[in-house]
Amino acid sequence: MSEDAIDLKYAKQVADYLHADHTEVIINKEIVLNALEEVIAMLGTWDITTIRASVGMYLVCKYIHEHTDIRVLLTGEISDELFGYKYTDFAPSAHEFQAESQKRIRELFMYDVLRADRSISVNSLEARVPFGD
């Protein structure tokens, strides 16, 4: 992520609104490449989508573990599946959107929770997943 990434702008706005302490963890190509073997070993999979999605979370969790005394995280995991990703914009009908949403929730355990589970726990952190409760 570059230092001018749009996500940083919005994260700062939210932190300012909540009067929260906010630290930006900038992750560049070199850091990602250096962590890649460790992330693959941690995940126990060669699935490229899982690996790609896990690297950032792993590195942020590692930073939190090494630089703070925080041990419990609140995550937004599962919210994309609940709210339909971008499919909400392109679904052919409300019925098909509902069917796809139900399918994603039924299959969630097969692919989407590995990233957070491993990336967080390997760094001695715990997660609270309100969208998954």
Residue spans for each PLM region:
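ATP-dependent adenylate-handling active sites, centered on carboxylate activation for C-N bond formation
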Residues: 1-132
